């Protein structure tokens, strides 16, 4: 009961790196630092897609990661909000001529896109906050149905 009360007012994010240079991942880590402190906005990072409201996907989707990304997406509860972070996640970026499928939207549906190489931490936070209401509304609906 207490866990659900706290979850109701927060947004839980799972970061998935599907290849690339890790530049976007470094910017996501910067979001956790005191300068940005995403937890002040009620945003928490998890490594379990089953706990996530939002998937933040970085890097181009490599051939090795395509099926794994689909599996992770399927494990994520509804509404399965996906945010593609950075140029590589949008189009394959500088890796598009390599062994990649392309951007994230070639493999799973994408709800929001953050351009940049890498994007600024503030852009990442703003985008998560823009998609948060949809995730929170869906979670509340699930909880209400569970109680009935």
Curated annotation (Swiss-Prot):
Cited SUPFAM superfamilies: HydA/Nqo6-like
Co-factor note (free text): Binds 1 [4Fe-4S] cluster.
Required co-factors: [4Fe-4S] cluster
GO MF term (any one): 4 iron, 4 sulfur cluster binding
Keyword rRNA-binding: no
Keywords: 4Fe-4S, Iron, Iron-sulfur, Metal-binding
The protein's name in its UniProt record: Uncharacterized protein MJ0516
């Amino acid at each position: 009961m207490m866990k659900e009360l706290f979850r109701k007012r927060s947004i839980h994010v799972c970061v998935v790196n599907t290849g690339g240079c890790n530049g976007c991942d470094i910017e996501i880590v910067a979001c956790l630092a005191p300068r940005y402190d995403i937890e002040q906005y009620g945003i928490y990072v998890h490594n379990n897609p089953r706990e996530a409201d939002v998937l933040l996907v970085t890097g181009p989707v490599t051939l090795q990661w395509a099926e794994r990304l689909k599996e992770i997406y399927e494990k994520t509860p509804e509404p399965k909000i996906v945010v593609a972070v950075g140029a590589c996640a949008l189009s394959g970026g500088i890796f598009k001529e390599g062994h990649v499928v392309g951007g994230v939207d070639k493999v799973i549906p994408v709800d929001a896109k953050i351009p940049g190489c890498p994007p600024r931490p503030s852009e990442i936070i703003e985008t998560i906050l823009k998609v948060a209401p949809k995730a929170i509304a869906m979670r509340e609906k699930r909880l209400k149905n569970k109680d009935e």
